[in-house]
Design a protein with these regions (language model features):
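Membrane-embedded alpha-helical bundles of multi-pass integral membrane proteins
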Residues: 2-217
Length: 217
């Protein structure tokens, strides 16, 4: 019984970490919402289509496509890649809470699932390359508009923090797939053989000497 109860320990740890993350997100969301509500109400119900069109252009970087097409395209790549890769986050959460492994694989079928995982890996690599370009433009090339007075201090730190977290997330995603691939090759029980790993396969030598227990952690 003790062994069986210990088997659920990783799921419990994952649950508490997830709950803490959700709690932190909720607190920050409420704080931002409270600050926004300090402003005065303004009737902005006129021209809804035009307002929505403008908001989407600004939000997804399309307004930069005209004045700075390369920067605009790179911004759009990061947005789309980040959103699509976070679809995989749903599976990670379900697996973490239930103790399952790649639970969406049998639901989607091997062909579609393998295609999606491979696509996510390619997107992760493209996001990494794009983030490095963005960081270099801000900190190495020192483009003039990034060094204006209003862009210094917290705005610069905030942008750099976002880029750093993007790198961490993409590296963790690819590392997870690399170790998962090794565990699948080792025929570890309960590890479903699913997924195609065109990018993370090149990370396998980094984890080849790790023990099975270390890879599973």
């Amino acid at each position: 019984e003790r062994i069986n109860s210990m088997a659920y320990l990783p799921n419990l740890i994952f649950f508490f970490l997830l709950a803490a993350a959700v709690g932190l997100f909720t607190r920050n969301f409420n704080r931002i919402s409270r600050n926004i509500k300090l402003g005065k109400d303004v009737d902005r119900n006129d021209r809804p289509k035009l307002r929505m069109k403008y908001m989407l252009r600004v939000a997804f970087g399309q307004s930069k496509m005209v004045s700075r097409p390369i920067a605009g395209a790179l911004h759009l790549l990061v947005y789309v890649g980040f959103i699509l890769i976070n679809i995989e986050l749903l599976e990670i959460i379900v697996d973490g809470l239930t103790g399952a492994h790649r639970i969406f694989a049998p639901l989607l079928g091997s062909s579609l699932y393998n295609f999606l995982i491979a696509s996510f890996e390619v997107l992760a690599l493209l996001v990494l390359v794009t983030v490095v370009i963005f960081w270099s433009r801000r900190n190495v090339m020192k483009i003039k508009r990034f060094w204006k007075p209003e862009m210094r201090g917290w705005p610069k730190k905030d942008a750099d923090f976002i880029l750093y977290f993007e790198v961490v997330l993409m590296v963790l995603f690819l590392s997870m797939n690399a170790t998962d691939s090794l565990l699948q090759q080792a025929n570890i029980e309960s590890y479903t053989k699913a997924g195609s790993f065109p990018i993370s396969q090149y990370l396998l030598p980094l984890f080849a000497d790790f023990s099975v227990e270390t890879r599973m952690c």
